[in-house]
Design a protein with these regions (language model features):
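ATP-dependent carboxylate/acyl-activation modules
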Residues: 2-7, 98, 104, 184-506
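Active-site/ligand-binding-proximal alpha/beta "capping" segment
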Residues: 79-126, 133-135, 381-391
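Glycine-rich nucleotide/cofactor/substrate-binding loop typically near the N-terminus or early
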Residues: 35-106
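Anion (oxyanion) recognition and catalysis
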Residues: 23-24, 41, 125, 136, ...
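Mobile "lid/hinge" segments at catalytic clefts and subdomain interfaces of large enzymes
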Residues: 131, 138-154
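Non-catalytic interaction/clamp surfaces of large macromolecular machines
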Residues: 149, 153-200, 208
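N-terminal glycine-/serine-/threonine-rich phosphate-binding loop
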Residues: 1-53
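Hydrophobic beta-strand scaffold residues
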Residues: 30, 47, 142-144, 345, ...
Length: 506
């Protein structure tokens, strides 16, 4: 008797090639439902609709299609249990040898702007997870495939093993099935529960060599069923990504996402920017960012918001870099970068989309906060000094404020010509970060501006900045001693702007 395959998929990638091989090479019969059955029929493949096989029509507008004993009996029957076989025969149920199923696109639906609760609920799959769990449970007797990436491997299994998939492959596929349903249910629960419950489930993509340090095991996980963010990036060349590479790449992505209208480049070391700049071209932006702190740039992570061209590639290979990421890479640029084969070059078309939440583990649980993705708006800023900023100063203040948001607190950025020229990060007191940033800027601090991620608790930071030649400052405001800082700025002829938004980063 021919073997039986049940197919019901939302993602039809690779479906026709798979089923054609099943029919022509391995003598499978096909049963399918809804749009999947129509796709197979349109491709000229012989297929029996689930409704015809079960004798029960689809009802409730398609909500009930595969929830039937002839389906689940065929999936769950144990071939080595005589009573199970007797039950199949008495109920005219064929054993199902292969289940190919993936689920309604719930996550894609809720990601759309303006989606309603009722629209989201209609994308909660019922029959799909039931088939996926049932077939995963019974992996000893059948195979389940829930990802088009599995299709070629499955066919090769059949070709190498006289038309049978190995137990090892079936068990591995069952695990993938359970992970798929767990991730799917997690997305639904998180959506419906809002802040009351937060579940984090990931599928391991890669075992990493180690974590932050060699004695710390680490792995990389994908959340959700669809690759997004770094899981959707393409690595063009270079060694495997490390834990620290990925952490720094995300820090670089967050900064570069602040700038869309103008070519921008940032260089990251230990999650802090050692150089960030805007330019008339991406090559100019990178050179300005590199020259901002060429010593720290050695071994850095570079993010660019424009495609890598040949001119930029020639600059990139002049120093040792761990990683470079950009939306794309031109062919001649890739050839140039190939001269430094160890540098990891990645492309990620959408560098602006990041996680909506930030999660941190603590003893006994974890903390969740919404990501700091507030967009800087100069129309909401308050100029609190007698001197008003020039248009050029205001643009520079905005640039520095966007970068300062991504510097570890206490964070200070000194900038000029849309380039960071001094960065003070992670100091326990704010004036300490101010002094570090100004020392790094040196003579370039004259006529530059300074941004602070938190308010100035005393006027010492204002006076220290003025002594170095700073002409304008931007900070959140909100200190009990704001008037002391404002008074000092007025005495010294400085501009000071309050944003009303704090950007602590720990």
């Amino acid at each position: 008797m021919a073997r039986l395959a049940l197919l019901s998929v939302s993602n039809k990638t690779g479906l026709i090639d798979l089923t054609r091989s099943l029919v022509e090479e391995f003598d499978f019969d096909l049963i399918s439902s809804g749009g999947t059955a129509q796709a197979l029929k349109d491709a000229g493949l012989p297929v029996t609709k689930v409704a015809d096989y079960t004798g029960s029509p689809e009802i409730l507008g398609g909500r009930v299609k595969t929830l039937h004993p002839r389906i689940h009996g065929g999936i769950l029957a144990r071939r080595d249990v005589p009573q199970d076989i007797t039950d199949l025969e008495n109920n005219q149920i064929r054993p199902i040898d292969l289940v190919v199923v993936n689920l309604y696109p719930f996550e894609e639906t809720i990601a759309k702007p303006g989606v309603t609760l009722s629209q989201a609920v209609e994308q909660i799959d019922i029959g799909g997870p039931a088939m996926l769990r049932a077939s995963s449970k019974n992996f000893a007797h059948l195979t389940v495939l829930c990802d088009p990436a599995q299709y070629d491997e499955y066919l090769e299994e059949l070709r190498q093993n006289n038309g049978e998939a190995s137990l090892e492959f079936r068990q591995k596929s069952a695990l993938k099935g359970f992970l798929h349903t767990a991730s799917y249910d997690q997305a639904i629960a998180s959506y419906l529960a809002e802040a009351q419950q937060h579940t984090l489930i990931g599928t391991q993509l890669q075992s990493l060599r180690y974590g932050e340090n060699p004695h710390q095991p680490a792995a990389w996980y994908q959340t959700g069923t669809t690759p997004t963010g770094w899981t959707a990036a393409t690595k063009l060349q270079g060694k495997e990504l490390s834990y620290n590479n990925l952490v720094d790449l995300e820090a670089a992505r967050r900064i570069i996402a602040e700038f869309t209208d103008t070519p921008a480049a940032t260089i990251i070391k230990h999650t802090n920017p050692c150089g960030t700049a805007l330019g008339s071209s991406i090559s100019e932006a990178y050179q300005k960012a590199f020259n901002a702190d060429s010593t720290s740039a050695f071994g850095g992570i570079v993010a660019l918001n424009r495609p890598i061209d040949a001119a930029t590639a020639k600059e990139l290979i002049k120093t040792f870099l761990e990683c470079v990421v950009a939306p794309s890479c031109e062919a001649d640029a890739q050839e140039i970068l190939g001269k430094k084969s160890n540098v990891r070059v990645l492309t990620l078309p959408d560098l602006s989309s990041g996680p909506k939440d930030t999660v941190k583990a603590i003893a006994g649980g974890f903390l969740v906060e919404s990501s700091d993705d507030v967009i800087a708006d100069t129309n909401q800023w308050q100029i609190v000094t007698e001197r008003q900023p020039t248009a050029s100063e205001l643009a520079e203040l905005l640039f520095a404020w966007k970068v300062c948001k991504h510097v570890k607190s206490n964070g200070i950025v000194v900038s000029g010509d849309r380039t960071t020229i001094g960065v003070g990060a992670g100091q326990m007191n704010r004036v300490g970060s101010v002094k570090i940033a100004l020392e790094q800027a040196g003579e370039k601090a004259k006529d530059a501006i300074l941004a602070s991620d938190g308010f100035f608790p005393f006027d010492d930071s204002v006076r220290t900045a003025a002594a170095a030649g700073i002409t304008a400052l931007v900070q959140p405001g909100g200190s009990l001693r704001d008037q002391d800082s404002i008074k000092a700025a007025n005495e010294l002829g400085l501009v000071m702007v309050f944003t009303g938004v704090r950007h602590f980063l720990h």
